[in-house]
Amino acid sequence: MNKFGAFLLLSMLACGFGAVSAQDAGNRGYKILQKVSLPGDGGFDFLTVDSDNRRIYITHNNSVQVIDADTLKLIGTVDNVPHPHGVVFLPDMGKGYATSGDPGSVIVFDLKTFKHLSEISASKDADVIIYDKASGHVVTFDGDSKNSTVIDPATDKVIQTVDLPGAPEVAVSDGKGYLYDNLESESKIIKIDAQTMKITKSWPLAPGASPSGLSMDLENNRLFSGCHNQLLVVMNAKNGKVVQTLPIGKSVDGTYFDPASATIFSSNGDGTLTVIHEDSPNKYTLVENVQTEEGAKTMAFDSKTGHVFLTTAQRGEAPTPTKEDPKPKRKIIPGTFHLLVLGK
């Protein structure tokens, strides 16, 4: 090896990547393509993309903001959604569902007019919401209440409320009759029968701790759990065995698996997007850590364009701690909320 080759290898190792294959290199080069300012100065949480119908749904400022995924223009707002968290959409039924953390309900809205259709009582801190095709149910995971609310979208009535053995975070459906959920307080993943809502398995994520974001490779039965101790844990969804762990940024809140490129993304509140390649179901390679912006911890992926969407806002200095509020949060600077578009 010549001196230049030795220097290049040492430089790559120092950056924490090691030798990068040609396939991995094809996943590199994500960058911020565009920043889109959006109105409102309140809090924000999850966002999701309807790639087929070209819509981005963003929970923000006691509402759901609806963005055209091509023009990136605000085209509508679902108003009066207090403390919004998650959104799921059912295009065939023409309606969407948004969780309202306080008082704890689900707002049903029309996908064309964005008007409220009904409000369904759930539990306090109604947070994550998903649709399971196998059972035909809409399911919420209610963090502080440590339970799950199951809704029949045909009637928009609650079928049952299920207690969980810990505070739930992000959940996914395998489309084959099972749900998987991160239990943040227990550092475990639970497997749930989607029809009966009975827990069939409970698996520790160690060495991962305090999991938040969760996504799944449906074909290869792999779960990707983003944990707050800066690890992405890859788990075999058949037997609960930890396949591999990889380093990610701080304050993760979202992960996504793109089957077309075999890429896992982890959106981190420290202002990074970790990109990982699935070389095989049992081998994963860290590709890059893309600089984003502080607070951009939730994400959505557009399967049509390959773009990653993140939301964030600038924050001021933290107020002086008091006895009543020993850890005051930094307040959002008015007029700074925006959507980040990342791609190659």
Segment roles from a protein language model:
Residues 1-8:
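Bacterial N-terminal signal peptides that target proteins for export
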Residues 11-15, 19-344:
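Predominantly soluble domains enriched in secretory-pathway, periplasmic, or organellar proteins
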